[in-house]
Design a protein with these regions (language model features):
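Arg/Lys-rich, positively charged N-terminal/basic patches that mediate binding to nucleic acids
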Residues: 1-35
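Non-catalytic, surface-exposed connector residues within folded enzymatic/regulatory domains
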Residues: 4, 25, 49-52, 88
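Residue-level signal for pocket-adjacent positions within structured domains
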Residues: 8-9, 18, 42, 50-53, ...
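Generic alpha-helical scaffold signal
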Residues: 29-32, 52, 68-72
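Short, surface-exposed, charge-dense and proline/glycine-enriched linear segments
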Residues: 35, 52-59, 74-84
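Conserved phosphate-interacting/catalytic interface
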Residues: 38
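A short, surface-exposed loop/turn module that caps and links secondary-structure elements
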Residues: 43-66
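Enriched for short, Lys/Arg-rich terminal
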Residues: 66-99
Length: 99
C-alpha cells in the first residue's frame, strides 16, 4: 500500500535510520516490521488481517487516526488519506502511550 510521512523525524528514521537511539531497540524493530507489512498490503483491509499488529481506530479527538502497536507502550499512529490515485496511509508519529 502507498504511504507517506507527516512527521519528518519518522521519515528520517525510515529512510536513513536517523533518531533510532531515541527509542528502545524492540520498538525500532517493530517499526520496520510494521512498515514492511504496510508496504506489502494491497489495501487497508489487509492490515486488519494481521492480528499481531493490533491495528485499530482511535477514538475521541483522534477518531480519524489509527494505530499499530509496536509494543505495550509504543504505537505507530497513522491516518487513511485519499488523493487522485486512491487511498494511502499517512504515517503520523511513533508515540509513547504511557505519557
Amino acid at each position: 500500500m502507498r504511504f507517506d510521512f507527516h512527521s519528518r523525524k519518522v521519515k528520517l528514521l525510515y529512510f536513513e535510520e536517523k533518531g533510532a537511539r531515541k527509542y528502545p531497540a524492540e520498538v525500532i524493530d517493530a517499526f520496520f516490521d510494521a512498515m514492511s507489512t504496510i508496504k506489502a498490503a494491497q489495501d487497508i483491509r489487509d492490515l486488519y488481517k494481521f492480528k499481531s499488529l493490533h491495528f485499530e481506530k482511535l477514538s475521541g479527538a483522534r477518531q480519524n487516526d489509527r494505530s499499530i502497536r509496536l509494543n505495550k507502550q509504543w504505537r505507530l499512529t497513522l491516518r487513511i488519506e485519499k488523493d487522485d490515485n486512491g487511498d494511502f496511509i499517512l504515517i503520523l508519529d511513533i508515540e509513547d502511550y504511557h505519557h
